[in-house]
Amino acid sequence: MRHKIKGRKLNVTSSHRQAMLANMAVALVTHEQIKTTLPKAKELRPYIETLITKAKKADLTVRRSVLSKIKDKKAVEKLINILGTRYKDRPGGYTRIIKAGFRYGDLAPIAYIEFVDRDINAKGNI
């Protein structure tokens, strides 16, 4: 029985899953919108939302905690300086998932995950 077991396995090892979520979080912070499979997007959502909630506080302890999760200094700077201030008054729900059909090769469900009040001109700019 799987009682109180959170998260999805995504058919990868735990270290692969942690690295994948960290890399996807960096991509989402950098581009503010990414395209991925629906289960990965659903796993990324609580991961990135906890990071943004921490980044709203913006002190040294938070910076070190976020840096231990995503390992990219430029993404951490953007997360704390830009996204933390952008969502300072929002109590949660910083991302949205938009279903985008199915992938041609294997019919995997595809989705976009993006920030709610995203800057459309921020594609790839840190």
Swiss-Prot record:
Belongs to the bacterial ribosomal protein bL17 family. This is Large ribosomal subunit protein bL17. GO terms for cellular component: cytosolic large ribosomal subunit. It holds the Pfam family Ribosomal_L17. The keyword Transit peptide does not apply. SUPFAM superfamilies: Prokaryotic ribosomal protein L17. One of its GO terms (molecular function) is structural constituent of ribosome. InterPro entries: Ribosomal_bL17 (IPR000456), Ribosomal_bL17_CS (IPR047859), Ribosomal_bL17_sf (IPR036373). One of its GO terms (biological process) is translation. It comes from Rickettsia felis (strain ATCC VR-1525 / URRWXCal2) (Rickettsia azadi). Part of the 50S ribosomal subunit. Contacts protein L32. Keywords: Ribonucleoprotein, Ribosomal protein. It comes from the Bacteria. HAMAP family: Ribosomal_bL17. The lineage of its organism: Bacteria, Pseudomonadati, Pseudomonadota, Alphaproteobacteria, Rickettsiales.
